């Protein structure tokens, strides 16, 4: 992946996350549920003052420091390894974008805007940045696991 594409991808993903959050705040009342695809998913505007699954509520400064450390580590790892694997770079782009997307909310609003509710399973309400983080971390785990087992494909 060309070096210029990395910051462009990160900015585009952050932009999408922030656009969705702004749309939700402007168009859905707090705690309102809108059935987008009945039985599949709804949009529900929540203000999450904790982490995933609403743990560690009202720990803003802890999350700000943790996010800066994680993003810093991911950026450092990317700079050191960006030519190693496109999949590795993609995983780090997702982690960095998701971290920054939620960081913006936490610093600017004091909470993270969540909105995606899966209706077919009992699961926490989440946002676009959370999706980036989840996919990025799972992809990174898979890559590191494959490297650990000697399979570099």
From Swiss-Prot:
TM segment ranges: 61-81, 85-105, 125-145
Organism superkingdom: Bacteria
Gene Ontology MF terms: aspartic-type endopeptidase activity
Catalytic class of the enzyme: hydrolase
Pfam families according to UniProt: Peptidase_A8
Membrane topology of the entry: Multi-pass membrane protein
Record-linked PROSITE patterns: SPASE_II (PS00855)
Keywords of the record: Aspartyl protease, Cell membrane, Hydrolase, Membrane, Protease, Transmembrane, Transmembrane helix
UniProt-listed GO biological process terms: proteolysis
Subcellular location: Cell membrane
Active-site residues, as the UniProt record annotates them: 114, 130
Cellular component terms per the entry's GO annotation: plasma membrane
EC numbers, comma separated: 3.4.23.36
UniProt catalytic activity: Release of signal peptides from bacterial membrane prolipoproteins. Hydrolyzes -Xaa-Yaa-Zaa-|-(S,diacylglyceryl)Cys-, in which Xaa is hydrophobic (preferably Leu), and Yaa (Ala or Ser) and Zaa (Gly or Ala) have small, neutral side chains
InterPro entries from the UniProt entry: Peptidase_A8
Protein's pathway: Protein modification; lipoprotein biosynthesis (signal peptide cleavage)
Task of the protein: This protein specifically catalyzes the removal of signal peptides from prolipoproteins.
HAMAP family in UniProt: LspA (MF_00161)
Family: Belongs to the peptidase A8 family.
Protein name: Lipoprotein signal peptidase
Provenance organism: Streptococcus thermophilus (strain ATCC BAA-491 / LMD-9)
